[in-house]
């Protein structure tokens, strides 16, 4: 089976770089892009067609849910996993309504994060 193609969108430089390093080493995953700007991430998602986008919605620009909406509209075959440091029940509900596959906290360990990403890919395999 081909590795799951992953795009990371997170405006926290240190966190984004750490995620890229952690997930680049994970078997079964290929990090195809990594950016802090959601607009750049959206363009990358349209161009690269990742299986999964890992998206931080609690952004300094306040545009996290807008980024999710745009991804859902423009990349309907890409699943989005929201990964955040700041859990928010209302945002979680909105994220799922918009189309997020899952909503998880950044303190998750790497093996569990990889499982969440792989679980987000599975529905596509059935199409």
Predicted feature residues:
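C-terminal output helix
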Residues: 90, 108-118, 125
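Conserved phosphotransfer microenvironments
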Residues: 38, 54-68
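Conserved acidic segment of CheY-like receiver
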Residues: 2-15, 19-23
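Short, conserved "switch-loop" micro-motifs in signal-transduction and mechanochemical regulators
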Residues: 86-87
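Short amphipathic alpha-helix used as the core "switch/output" element in two-component signaling
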Residues: 65-77
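Acidic, metal-coordinating helix/loop segments flanking the phosphotransfer/catalytic sites
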Residues: 36-52
């Amino acid at each position: 089976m081909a590795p799951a193609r992953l795009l990371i969108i997170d405006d926290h430089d240190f966190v984004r770089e750490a995620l890229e390093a952690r997930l680049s080493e994970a078997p079964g995953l290929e990090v195809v892009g990594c950016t802090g700007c959601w607009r750049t991430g959206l363009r990358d998602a349209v161009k690269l067609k990742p299986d999964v986008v890992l998206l931080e919605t609690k952004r300094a620009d306040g545009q996290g849910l807008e980024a999710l909406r745009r991804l859902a509209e423009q990349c309907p075959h890409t699943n989005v996993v929201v990964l955040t440091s700041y859990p928010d029940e209302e945002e979680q509900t909105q994220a799922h309504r918009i189309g997020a596959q899952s909503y998880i906290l950044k303190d998750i360990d790497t093996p569990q994060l990889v499982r969440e990403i792989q679980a987000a890919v599975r529905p596509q395999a059935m199409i």
